Amino acid sequence: TYCRRCIDFGRSDDNFVKFHINIPVSKIEAPKKPSVRLSDVQEVASERLVDNTRKALNTLVWAVCGAGKTEIVYEVIYQAILESKTICLAIPRRDVVKELSERFYRDFSGYPISVLHGEEKVLEESNFYIMTTHQLVKYYNYFDIVIIDEVDAFPYSGDECLENGAKTSLKNNGVLAFLSATPSNKIK
């Protein structure tokens, strides 16, 4: 038997052996701190996100389109890199994965970033990943922090398989952060 909802991820049944590998990452020189100008409100949101992450609290960053939600997560990503945590920025759409991976590579001074989506898999020796939400199902108990951008967007929103994949990709004390302009009541 197999799960009809999960068939898009490849067949997996009782005869399929599942395993988990921790990929060690050697010490990589930290990037220069990104120089991003935040408004006072963005600064407060960024500080709260960092603080909540340190306290292992899941967080919703709720702001209108164009309010700079991406810039708000720069500090938590930078701090995670400094603390050698494994972090993932997951987005439902691959075009946004491509756009953000170029932007983060530039803003984080060429720091290696693993980029994964349906058309591309660039695995770097790094603790920073940018991927589509579909890729999260392949990472069991792996990330310290998962940030899901556009959490309200298709195909992530309302897809139990993808939502569960995000949760199971986290380590035991892992933290989820959601970015959205229009979060569902379930996320709020």
Can you annotate each of these PLM segments?
Residues 99-143:
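Conserved motor-coupling elements within RecA-like helicase/translocase cores
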Residues 34-57:
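N-terminal pre-P-loop "Q-motif" helix
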Residues 85-93:
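Conserved RecA-like ASCE P-loop NTPase motor core of nucleic-acid helicases/translocases
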Residues 1-25:
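Interdomain "pre-motor" coupling segment immediately N-terminal to P-loop NTPase/helicase cores
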Residues 93-96, 122, 136, 153-154, ...:
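Residues immediately C-terminal
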Residues 143-188:
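Post-DEXD/H (motif II) to motif III coupling segment of the RecA-like Helicase ATP-binding lobe
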Residues 85-86, 112, 125-129, 142-145, ...:
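Loop/turn-to-beta-strand initiation segments
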Residues 54-78:
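Walker A/P-loop
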